[in-house]
Amino acid sequence: MKFDSIPGMIEPAEQELLYEVSKALDLSKKYSIVELGSFFGKSTNSIIHGLNDNSTNEGSVFHVYDSFKCQRNGNLAQHVVGFSEKFKVNHLLKKEGNSIDFLDVFKFYTANKFDKLKIHQNELLDSTYSDKAKIAFLFIDAPKFYNEFYDVLKIFFLHLDVGSKVIFQDFFFHWSGTVIPAIEIMFQRKLISFEKTAASSLLITIEKKINKDEVRKINDFYQKSTLSDLIQSIYERLSSKKIDRHNYFLNRLIMAKIQVMVKNESNLDGAKELSISTFNKIGKIDPQSAKLLEYDLQHFFKNNFDLQKLYNLDHL
């Protein structure tokens, strides 16, 4: 599939996955599609292409949620400014005080592409879903930490049907250490099943209706668990699956585990031992993946293993 040239941080393999899933959805009943985290619209555009090629789509609403803002001193600003200058859309940025609003950039890249595109500009915590339609496909490129993901569970997962598709865009990501355990809990409770991966994205299918009581049970399980143990469990669960660029992305779960062991569990010795054994193993069989993983580890050290602070610069 040839996609429009739109700046963004998802890979071509992830664009193809978004297109394939959107095109294959059964939208013959009244369903909606939801995207959490749209940036400039690269992922949005991929989904739109799929929906436009979906023969069962007759008026489904596509809801997109994003603050469409960042702070000048935040982590996201370098990408917002850099991409907008490179693609010559920086005149569409609205700068006020320490804030940069890029909603008009998103509108520029998505204008007249899909009749029923509904934009929600707000922080995730302030989001609501009031559409009466069930959600056929939920694409999540927003929460990197469990407290935000818990909001997603409460706000959006209640509206998913059995058979609905969910893509966690940054699942195989060293920032996602507190989100990954929650997804393992959902696997253990047989709420979801594995479909496939593309780069850092994980595609799953909803196998059991998720209600408020189930969300409470997930949270109770999470609060009582050792996060690094849950990450190890999902690492083992997925080790036998076909994972895109297996050595790199699967072992990014180990990077997330190391971050959790240091930041959340104060287990520095265990994290050091795991780091040494991981790099010794991967370095022998895949030096290129080991080099990329080393960059993740250096990123941890640079930020004292506290990635929440970087995230907060953009969202608080």
Regions flagged by a language model, labelled:
Residues D4-L17:
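Conserved SAM-binding loop and adjacent beta-strand
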Residues Q15-E20, N122:
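A Trp-anchored, charged/polar loop motif used as the substrate-binding/catalytic surface
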Residues K2-D4, K23-N312:
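S-adenosylmethionine/decaboxylated-SAM
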